């Protein structure tokens, strides 16, 4: 799926105080030794779960579209996710500290 564009807000912040190499499954941090999800597209570090504010992106939350960290930092900027916005783990951890739930976000092509 393509990353939706338009106006959004941060609906929920997940992962405060977690180590930057934390892997999440269904928004729950895995414990060391837990099996990794059966995907290469791991959600890591922090999650900013987006709510769509436009008619064209109103289903964003239901599609589980996040801004999140990744283990594939070399693919940042390439169309390689399932619709999420991937960031370097250190960068998404910093962004996480700077925004509150309800902060507005604009995603453009």
Question: Across the structure, where does each feature detected by a protein language model lie?
Answer:
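Electropositive
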Residues: 1-14, 18
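Exported/periplasmic cell-wall-interacting domains
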Residues: 2, 18-109
């Amino acid at each position: 799926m393509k990353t939706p564009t338009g106006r959004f807000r941060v609906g929920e912040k997940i992962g405060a105080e977690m180590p930057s190499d934390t892997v999440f499954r269904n928004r729950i941090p895995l414990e060391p030794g837990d099996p990794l999800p059966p995907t290469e597209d791991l959600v890591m570090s922090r999650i900013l779960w987006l709510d769509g504010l436009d008619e064209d992106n109103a289903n964003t939350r239901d599609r589980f579209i996040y801004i999140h960290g990744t283990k594939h930092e070399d693919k940042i900027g390439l169309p390689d996710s399932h619709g999420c916005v991937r960031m370097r783990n250190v960068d998404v951890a910093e962004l996480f500290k700077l925004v509150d739930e309800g902060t507005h976000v604009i995603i453009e092509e």
